[in-house]
Regions:
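Inter-lobe coupling/hinge segments of SF2-like helicase ATPases
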Residues: 198-204, 208-212, 220-654, 658, ...
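Small-residue-enriched segments and motifs
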Residues: 3-8, 20, 48, 393, ...
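Nucleotide-binding motor/catalytic cores of P-loop/tubulin-like NTPases across gene-expression machines
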Residues: 671, 689-693, 718
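Short beta-strand/turn "edge" motifs
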Residues: 680-691, 737
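Generic solvent-exposed, charged/amphipathic alpha-helical segments
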Residues: 86-89, 499, 503, 583, ...
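Short beta-strand elements
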Residues: 512, 668-684, 725-733
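A short, contiguous, amphipathic alpha-helix enriched in charged residues
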Residues: 5, 17, 651-666
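Accessory, non-ATPase domains that flank or precede helicase/AAA+ motor cores in DNA-metabolism machines
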Residues: 1-360, 367, 372-388, 420, ...
Length: 739
């Protein structure tokens, strides 16, 4: 039999596999797809994933290098996840090596063993008693023994200090055979016979009907869109479905859009379940992430909660996938492997033959279209849980009204009345910083970023101008860089300015700012929300971080300071995003006994979109928007791919895209492909960003299959084009941002 040739995927942008000979002493029978091998690659070493073992190679046998080492006895990637990665690589036209690497925790990419660490666990020894005379006069030992007795499954060595357990006391107890030490693998917890740690909440008729419909599809793949108004109890539906999944001996994967939602989601699940819960997102360290990943793979985590990358967490016994806030743009990866976690979760659920639930108060138009056409089951929750009422909307026309740091007089009055009534107020302004720009009142100079076609935002607290696009920062100048005068004025309002002004207007009440700047410290978000949950009258000022899934029962007024930004945009999705944001922010009001009110400041109070959204609701808006998309031939009635390019010199990116466009036109004619339109190339909406000039070419197709047939052949040509070496380019399949 000829020597085995290993075909490996390496973490490289090159869309090809690499052939190697087997490592010395490794037999063909030991090799299986999904295993990791360390291989030489140029002057360095890399970790590759075995895709197949074959007898043939286009490279002469004497030119093939041997792999250096086989790192696994069994593939760390289960076959089902390996299959998902193959599909992902093909659909998103991305390197298989990069895709497989992305699916692995960082430590596995670096060659660490795919095994959970062994840890020492301390527990009370069989037959030990608090009445043992040997500890009668040893209060610290008695206290340590009593603490251990409260943890019948043992306490991990690393948690001793957290429980105030003295190692010296434990060593003395060990010498007396009153405690024991067991070395075993670390896991998130131990399985319980009774899943519920607290009783479930009673369901209303709509919630009950939704649970029953989803439960009827538990034995195979079914997709459901749970479209429930804010505060309708979608989370309670999730929890009861998960309990039924656990009772069937299976695992549940729950995706959330933001890291900041992780702690409160975890707390809610821990309060409800006696279950082993793994948290997977970029905020946990590499070791914790590996442990959670392995626990899920080996069936030792019952519930996996995480952001978009948690989609690639393996499950030994998959039973249910839930995508919360499925409309959220955070589920789309914008760099490297540009996958959409929601769309890929549907593929995974189909491959695993399990149900998937997409939940949102403001479903994406794509998901609504799939529900209306029967691809998903549509489940509506139209009433708020617990008898809470929907908030009332008021459009406040601020034309010709004076604005004090962006806040009108009637808005100030409404805020004051709410605080005086002992309630909380949420002030929404989707703009960080003190002011969007700095203006010279003498010559008209404005603070622009030297690396981007964008204004520098004033951050007064730190005395800085910052670009929110490339991160460039500089001190606020004392004199105008253009004319030398000193009359420099912040123009417009951001959350920092609103916070400052509200503190002056309402000095007797706390003003809490919730944005990326104020929550950058570890646990800052938890501390802010702990203050809010005390229920004392206060003002929350924040960006869209406040709109995502948070429960503020004492908020009865939501003040939206500027609703006009999304009404005029070159991006066809802008109105959808604006509608979702307004409804989600409004949904924070009146979630308990007190009714809520939403006041929207606008210069366009008669705009048809605002009227429809505030008077008829999100679904009326969505149906109108779908009709407009159908007429314009836009998603979900068409399929898009976006080729982006950027270069240091003007014109280089567009020159590359011009050549790429010509190649695409030639392929269309050669393969007789129809229904595909090439739009561009054109400069990007922000042409210069981080010192690079950017351009893009949009492909719009009536059907998905011809588009992907074109993309596969086209990319091979793009990789060989000499002009492509002078630019940085990427292909985005199903783009959500045309930036």
């Amino acid at each position: 039999m000829p020597d085995a040739i290993l075909r490996l995927a390496l973490p490289s942008p090159l869309r090809r596999l690499f052939d190697y000979r087997a490592p010395a002493g490794v037999l063909r029978a030991q090799l299986h797809p999904g295993m990791r091998l360390r291989v030489p690659f140029g002057r360095r070493e890399m970790i590759g994933i075995l895709v197949e073992v074959t007898d043939h190679s286009e490279v002469p046998a004497d030119k093939l290098k041997p792999a250096l080492a086989l790192l696994d006895a069994t593939p760390p990637l289960p076959a089902s996840l390996f299959k998902l990665c193959l599909w992902t690589s093909q659909y998103y036209q991305h390197s298989l090596g990069d895709t497989l690497s992305w699916a692995l925790p960082v430590l596995l990419r670096q060659g660490e063993p795919a095994e959970a660490r062994q840890e020492r666990f301390w527990s009370v020894a069989p037959g030990a008693s608090m009445d043992d005379p040997r500890i009668a006069r040893a209060p610290r030992q008695r206290e340590a023994l009593a603490t251990l007795a409260q943890h019948p499954h043992g306490v991990a060595h690393q948690l001793l200090s957290k429980l105030m357990l003295s190692k010296d006391s434990l060593d003395l107890l060990l010498a007396k055979d009153l405690v024991q030490v067991e070395v075993r693998r670390h896991a998130p917890g131990l399985r319980h016979e009774h899943w519920l740690a607290q009783p479930e909440l009673p369901l209303n008729a709509e919630q009950r009907a939704a649970c029953e419909a989803i439960r009827a599809g538990f034995d195979s793949y079914h997709a459901f869109l749970l479209a429930g108004v804010t505060g309708s109890g979608k989370t309670e539906v999730y929890l009861q479905l998960i309990r039924q999944t656990l009772e069937a001996g299976k695992q549940a994967l729950v995706l959330i859009p933001e890291i900041n939602l992780g702690p409160q989601t975890l707390a809610r699940f821990e309060q409800r379940f006696n279950a082993r819960i793994a948290l997977v997102h970029s905020g946990v360290n590499d070791r914790e992430r590996l442990e959670a990943w392995l626990a899920a793979r080996d069936g030792e985590a019952d519930i996996i909660i995480g952001t978009r990358s948690a989609l690639f967490t393996p499950m030994k016994n998959p039973g249910l996938i839930i995508i919360d806030e499925e409309h959220d743009g955070s589920y789309k990866q914008q760099e490297g492997l540009r996958y959409h976690a929601r769309d890929l979760a549907l593929v995974r659920a189909r491959q695993e033959n399990i149900p998937i639930v997409l939940g949102s108060a403001t479903p994406s138009l794509e998901s609504l279209h799939n529900a209306y056409t029967g691809r998903y089951g549509l489940l509506r929750l139209n009433e708020r849980a617990g008898g809470a009422k929907q908030p009332r909307f008021l459009r406040l026309d601020v034309k010709s009204r004076p604005l004090d740091s962006g806040i009108s007089g009637p808005m100030q009055q409404a805020i004051g009345q709410t605080l005086a009534a002992g309630q909380q107020v949420l002030v929404f302004l989707n703009r960080r910083g003190f002011a969007p720009t700095l203006l010279c009142h003498d010559c008209g100079w404005m603070s622009g970023c030297e690396r981007c076609d964008a204004r520098m935002t004033v951050h007064q607290r730190h005395g800085e101008l910052r670009c929110h696009h490339c991160g460039h920062a500089e001190r606020v100048p004392r004199h105008c860089p253009q004319c030398g005068k000193v009359d420099l004025r912040p123009v417009g309002a951001g959350t920092e300015r609103a916070e400052e002004r509200l503190g002056i207007l309402f000095p007797d009440y706390p003003v809490l700012r919730v944005d990326r700047d104020s929550t950058s410290r570890k646990d800052a978000m938890n501390q802010l929300f702990a203050t809010i949950q005390k229920g004392q009258p206060c003002i929350l000022v924040g960006t869209q971080m406040l709109a995502k899934g948070h429960h503020f029962p004492r908020v009865t007024l939501v003040s939206i300071l500027d609703a006009d930004g999304g009404l005029f945009s070159g991006d066809f999705r802008a109105s959808e995003r604006m509608a979702q944001l307004i409804v989600q922010v409004a949904g924070r009001a009146g979630r308990a006994e007190e009714p809520g009110k939403v006041i929207i400041q606008t210069h366009l109070a008669d705009h048809p979109l605002l009227i429809q959204l505030t008077e008829q609701g999100y679904f009326a808006f969505a149906e109108q928007a779908l009709s407009e998309r159908r007429g314009a031939g836009l998603p979900p009635f068409a399929h898009l791919a976006l080729l982006r390019a950027e270069a240091h010199k003007p014109g280089q990116a567009e020159a590359f895209l011009d050549e790429a466009c010509s190649e695409a036109e030639r392929l269309l004619a050669q393969q007789n492909l129809t229904g595909i339109e090439l739009l561009g190339p054109v400069p990007a909406p922000m042409e210069r960003r981080a010192g690079r000039y950017r351009a893009q070419l949009l492909l719009q197709a009536n059907a998905r299959a011809p588009l992907h047939r074109l993309l596969s052949a086209w990319l091979l040509l793009l990789e060989q084009m000499p002009s492509g070496r002078a630019v940085r380019w990427s292909l985005d399949v199903d783009p959500v941002d045309l930036y």
